């Protein structure tokens, strides 16, 4: 199977490696010439995956048309808030019969659309040809070939199975699901809860606090998912609970690390500077998810608290006090 991976960051490069290790013909699109050259000549991507040896069968290009040409599966590995613009540039070259696989985890800021909805809207692809990947998938660990599992969600189960077979490597086990909504909501919302866990950790708070945030965070993610039509069982699986635990617990998680810097007292700009100018996905998603929840009448207090810190200049201590001072109720 021919795979075109659009985006050579840590996650895109890792998935390109997995597809290659599973026996696929993979072309990886990189925005920067030096990244593509290094992948082709040194078989490494030191900018995003330092120390990881890439398969010699994996080729890179800076030409989108070359990566997309005759692809059976197009993997979209760009940030959620840039997906629409990138797709507008690429859609004319995406093969009509290709399956589209989204790696982005977020809700579009202005439209409140999920990533699969953005893909279908911009490309004109039928929803049953758009799939999403979600699970406890920290890129570095998978690139190191540590055993992991993931979920491929598509409303067409046969199309999900096609991607599942193409992506199955000795160290990477994909499951399938037809609940695209649940997988996308779990993937988008966990970044916000991970920010909250990072903030708590940055303030020196302990495991009880983190466990409380994760558990109650899962409860509010489930409320939103169900309100949008998700199967609640999805959110207790790999794409919900699994992804949440990994992202909230690991120092490899960009969202958790960014939150920890905010918890230590850094401003948003200072935290961004400490991460080479990158803003964690959860910072952007907290705004769109909080507003989406409001529009649906869904109570998401942790998400709203993170939104307050990131977009309303509230401090972390006040966030904790507000959460602990909420009206008492049953679980």
UniProtKB/Swiss-Prot annotation:
Disulphide bridges: none
PROSITE patterns assigned: NAD_G3PDH
What reaction gets catalysed by this protein? sn-glycerol 3-phosphate + NAD(+) = dihydroxyacetone phosphate + NADH + H(+); sn-glycerol 3-phosphate + NADP(+) = dihydroxyacetone phosphate + NADPH + H(+)
Catalytic residues? 190
Chain sites annotated for binding NADPH: 10-11, 31-32, 105, 139, 254, 279, 281
Family to which this protein belongs = Belongs to the NAD-dependent glycerol-3-phosphate dehydrogenase family.
Judging by the UniProt lineage, the source's domain of life is: Bacteria
Pathway membership of this protein? Membrane lipid metabolism; glycerophospholipid metabolism
Q: Which controlled-vocabulary keywords does the entry list?
A: Cytoplasm, Lipid biosynthesis, Lipid metabolism, NAD, NADP, Nucleotide-binding, Oxidoreductase, Phospholipid biosynthesis, Phospholipid metabolism
| Cellular component GO terms held in the UniProt record | cytosol
Gene3D superfamilies registered for this protein in UniProt? N-(1-d-carboxylethyl)-l-norvaline Dehydrogenase, domain 2, NAD(P)-binding Rossmann-like Domain
Question: Recorded E.C. number(s)?
Answer: 1.1.1.94
By which gene is this protein encoded?
Answer: gpsA
The EC class name is: oxidoreductase
- GO MF term list: glycerol-3-phosphate dehydrogenase [NAD(P)+] activity; NAD binding
Record: residues binding sn-glycerol 3-phosphate: 105, 135, 190, 243, 253-255
Q: What are the GO BP annotations of this UniProt entry?
A: carbohydrate metabolic process; glycerol-3-phosphate biosynthetic process; glycerol-3-phosphate catabolic process; glycerophospholipid metabolic process; phospholipid biosynthetic process
Q: What is the name listed in the Swiss-Prot or TrEMBL entry for this protein?
A: Glycerol-3-phosphate dehydrogenase [NAD(P)+]
What organism does the record attribute this protein to? Corynebacterium diphtheriae (strain ATCC 700971 / NCTC 13129 / Biotype gravis)
Q: Where in the cell is it found?
A: Cytoplasm
């Amino acid at each position: 199977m021919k795979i075109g991976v659009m985006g050579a960051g840590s996650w895109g490069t890792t998935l390109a490696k997995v597809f290659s290790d599973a026996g696929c013909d993979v072309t990886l699109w990189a925005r920067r010439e030096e990244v593509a050259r290094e992948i082709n000549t040194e078989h490494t991507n030191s900018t995003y995956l330092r120390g990881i040896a890439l398969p010699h069968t994996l080729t890179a290009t800076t030409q989108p048309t070359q990566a997309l040409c005759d692809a059976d599966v197009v993997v979209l590995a760009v940030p959620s808030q840039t997906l629409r613009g990138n797709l507008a540039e690429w859609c004319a070259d995406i093969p009509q019969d290709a399956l589209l696989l989204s790696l982005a985890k977020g809700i579009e800021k202005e439209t409140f659309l999920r990533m699969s909805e953005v893909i279908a809207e911009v490309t004109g692809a039928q929803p049953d040809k758009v799939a999403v990947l979600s699970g406890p998938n920290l890129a570095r660990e998978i690139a190191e070939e540590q055993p992991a599992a993931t979920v491929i969600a598509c409303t067409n189960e046969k199309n999900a199975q096609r991607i599942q077979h193409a992506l199955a490597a000795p160290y990477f086990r994909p499951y399938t699901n037809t609940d695209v909504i649940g997988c996308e909501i779990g993937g988008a919302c966990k970044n916000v809860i991970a920010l909250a866990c990072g903030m708590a950790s940055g303030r020196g708070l302990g495991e009880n606090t983190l466990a409380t945030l994760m558990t109650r965070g899962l409860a509010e993610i489930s409320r939103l998912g169900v309100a949008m039509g998700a199967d609640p069982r999805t959110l207790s699986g790999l794409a919900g609970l699994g992804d949440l635990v990994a992202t909230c617990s690991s120092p490899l998680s960009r969202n958790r690390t960014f939150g920890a810097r905010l918890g230590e007292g850094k401003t948003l700009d200072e935290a961004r500077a400490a991460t080479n100018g990158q803003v964690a996905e959860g910072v952007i998603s907290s705004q769109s998810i909080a507003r989406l929840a409001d529009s649906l009448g869904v109570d998401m207090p942790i998400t709203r608290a993170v939104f307050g810190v990131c977009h309303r200049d509230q401090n972390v201590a006040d966030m904790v006090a507000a959460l602990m001072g909420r009206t008492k109720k049953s679980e």
